[in-house]
């Protein structure tokens, strides 16, 4: 079903998010879904979340994405296991999304793993992050956003845009520094499951 859907949408989309255990539910691995999309001529945005893997496994998955020539990685913290279909699962969170961005940027730019070991043929990716544009201003929402930019985010995806003035405030006050921001609109989003 996943491959069939990829074929059907190939000419209609610029890129497709491939989630990584979205909502703390068991799904196809994001690198595998990304490979299917690449084979069908669809550009993937491979999501990598920190909930289920330690830094060794995360770096291994990122290296695998590079070997498969996945062009875009989006680093996420991950939903808590209690939100999913197996609430007794133990979360890992060895890194957070900012730390994972730093790691991927170092692997790409410095050709180094966290251990300092060299990555001979450093992968090339566009690195992204997610941001909630509706966090109350009193919560200091842009500190974490600024940290993601400093860590290497080159694009940001937001949650669905229902409040256009609130989204405009985020764009104006968020300190985007030339970053590409993709505000998700319901009419532009095609959802299909990689189960």
Q: What does each model-found stretch correspond to?
A:
Residues 15-17, 43-47, 72-74, 124-128, ...:
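Structural preference for beta-strand elements that scaffold enzyme active sites
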Residues 16-26, 48-50, 74-76, 154-163:
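Catalytic beta/alpha-barrel core
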Residues 24-36, 54-60, 80-116, 138-140, ...:
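Active-site-adjacent beta->alpha loops and helix N-cap segments on the catalytic face
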Residues 50-68:
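Glycine-rich anion/phosphate-binding loops
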Residues 1-18:
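Conserved N-terminal beta1-alpha1 strand-loop-helix module at the mouth
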Residues 176-195:
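N-terminal low-complexity segments that are often proline-rich with Ser/Thr-Pro
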Residues 16, 65, 148, 152:
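Conserved, mostly hydrophobic/aromatic
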Residues 1, 22, 44-56, 125-140:
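Active-site mouth loops of central-metabolism enzymes
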């Amino acid at each position: 079903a996943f491959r069939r859907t990829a074929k059907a949408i190939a000419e209609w989309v610029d890129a497709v998010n491939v989630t990584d255990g979205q909502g703390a539910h068991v799904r196809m691995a994001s690198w595998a879904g990304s490979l299917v999309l690449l084979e069908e001529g669809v550009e993937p945005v491979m999501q990598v979340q920190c909930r289920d893997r330690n830094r060794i496994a995360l770096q291994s998955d990122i290296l695998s994405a590079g070997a498969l020539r996945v062009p875009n990685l989006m680093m996420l913290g991950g939903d808590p296991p209690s939100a999913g279909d197996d609430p007794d699962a133990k979360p890992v969170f060895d890194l957070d999304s900012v730390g994972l961005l730093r790691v991927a940027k170092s692997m790409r730019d410095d050709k180094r793993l966290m251990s300092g070991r060299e990555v001979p043929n450093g992968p090339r990716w566009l690195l992204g992050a997610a941001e909630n544009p509706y966090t109350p201003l009193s919560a200091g929402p842009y500190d974490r956003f600024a940290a993601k930019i400093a860590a290497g985010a080159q694009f940001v995806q937001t949650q669905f845009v229902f409040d256009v003035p609130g989204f405009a405030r985020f764009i104006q006050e968020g300190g985007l520094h030339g970053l590409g921001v993709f505000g998700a609109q319901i009419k532009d989003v095609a959802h299909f499951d990689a189960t």
